[in-house]
Design a protein with these regions (language model features):
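Catalytic cores of secreted/periplasmic or lumenal enzymes
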Residues: 181
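Alpha-helix C-terminal capping/helix-coil junction sites
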Residues: 56, 117, 121-122, 185
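Proteins with a high burden of low-complexity, intrinsically disordered sequence enriched in S/T/G/P/A and R
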Residues: 1-2, 184, 189, 195-196
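Amphipathic alpha-helical interaction segments
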Residues: 19-21, 49, 111, 120, ...
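Acidic, turn/loop-rich segments in luminal/extracellular domains of secretory-pathway
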Residues: 1-34
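Small side chains
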Residues: 5, 15-17, 63, 117-120
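Feature responds to low-complexity, polar/acidic, surface-exposed segments characteristic
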Residues: 33-50, 57, 62-84, 88-115, ...
Length: 196
């Protein structure tokens, strides 16, 4: 379709074999909707464009605008703070403005992330990294797949699977994340070997 076009179309078809048997008619309907967010990404292919657009329209993640183009940056590393914000926005968690989080590294947490950190603690999905002086959020650090699996596991809260059945690669993750990774594998959120 043309850029920024909207509308719909449909067609009906039947299939016939060499013996002359004809199938019942089937109808295919195609609907193209305009983006509600006004964001169209220059760096997403067909496979990821719809998911990226959905995140923007929900206000979960909009990427970066450079000049007059939007970039989703699918290969960019996501920080612990960014991941937590996306998860909480997607889950519809209540996020209220706060100035302090209770984490030992509170001064290093950007203002935009403090509310998400506090909400993550309140929702029971964020505990931080333990240190001898207390837990730190490490907001700007890249999130590992094991950490991401743990956060998602806590948000989804669907119960535990039998690790012997679902998790063939237990040695590849820290022990504290094994059950979460196994649970996410059982849900097809992660696949064996995709975590670190």
């Amino acid at each position: 379709p043309k850029e920024n076009a909207a509308g719909g179309d449909s067609f009906t078809y039947s299939a016939a074999n060499s013996a002359g048997a004809v199938s019942l008619p089937a109808t295919v309907t195609v609907t193209i909707e305009k983006t509600r967010s006004g964001v169209t990404y220059a760096d997403t292919g067909e496979a990821t464009a719809t998911a990226a657009q959905d995140l923007a329209e929900r206000g979960v993640f909009t990427g970066a605008k450079i000049g007059d183009k939007w970039y989703f940056e699918p290969d960019r590393t996501v920080s612990r703070g960014e991941f937590l914000a996306m998860v909480l926005e997607t889950a519809g968690a209540e996020v209220t403005d706060v100035t302090m989080t209770g984490f030992r590294d509170d001064d290093a947490i950007p203002t935009w992330a403090k509310s998400y950190a506090a909400a993550g603690v309140a929702e029971g999905i964020l505990r931080g990294k333990p240190t001898e002086n207390g837990a730190v959020f490490s907001c700007e650090d890249p999130i590992s797949f094991s950490e991401a699996a743990t956060v998602l596991n806590r948000v989804l809260d669907l119960g535990d699977v039998e690790l012997e059945v679902w998790f063939a690669d237990r040695e590849a993750v820290p022990s504290w994340a094994a059950q979460a990774v196994g649970n996410m594998e059982a849900l097809n959120v992660l696949s064996v070997g995709s975590f670190g």
